[in-house]
A protein has these predicted regions:
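HotDog/MaoC-like acyl-thioester-processing domains
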Residues: 1-7, 88, 93-149
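Hot-dog-fold acyl-thioester-processing enzymes
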Residues: 1-86
């Protein structure tokens, strides 16, 4: 059964704050095989003009996944999480994320469409610091596979 189009525009406000730490950044950089000194060495980051180590551009996937899960688990939407796959992801950064950031995320369902028996959800998230300043906007396409015939 197709997802309800009336969910287009639904917003999911922040429910917690994500604390960005040096170790989290280092682990993520190591996981993606990026040895950039700006991700590992506080002195190198400061010399480049940053307050602390910065995160790789895709680091925000870590907190964005929690937002996607919040939508997927919304009982009113009725999405079958076991049938969902991540289609694509894009980031529009206002500034680099750095150790010491406290981030909050507001998620919105931008579009829902059905095609070839599958549902496609376009989800955006605004990631802000605790002062409300925009840090990054993300966009994800989620695909909910239809039932096999």
């Amino acid at each position: 059964m197709p997802l309800d189009q009336s969910f287009i525009g639904r917003t999911y406000p922040p429910t917690s704050t994500y604390s960005v730490g040096r170790e989290k950044i280092r682990e993520f950089a190591d996981a993606i095989g990026d040895g950039n000194a700006l991700y590992h060495d506080p002195e190198a980051a400061r010399a480049a003009g940053y307050p602390d180590v910065i995160a790789p551009p895709t680091f925000l996937t870590v907190i964005n996944l929690a937002a996607i899960n919040k939508i997927a688990e919304d009982p009113e939407l009725g999405m079958d999480y076991s049938r969902m796959v991540h289609g694509d992801q894009s980031f529009q950064h206002v500034r680099p994320v750095h150790a010491g950031d406290e981030l909050r995320l507001t998620t919105r369902i931008e579009d829902i469409m059905a095609r070839a028996g599958n549902d496609f959800l376009t989800v955006t998230a605004e990631i802000t610091d605790t002062d409300g300043a925009l840090v990054c906007t993300t966009r994800a396409q989620l695909v909910v596979r239809g039932e096999a015939a």
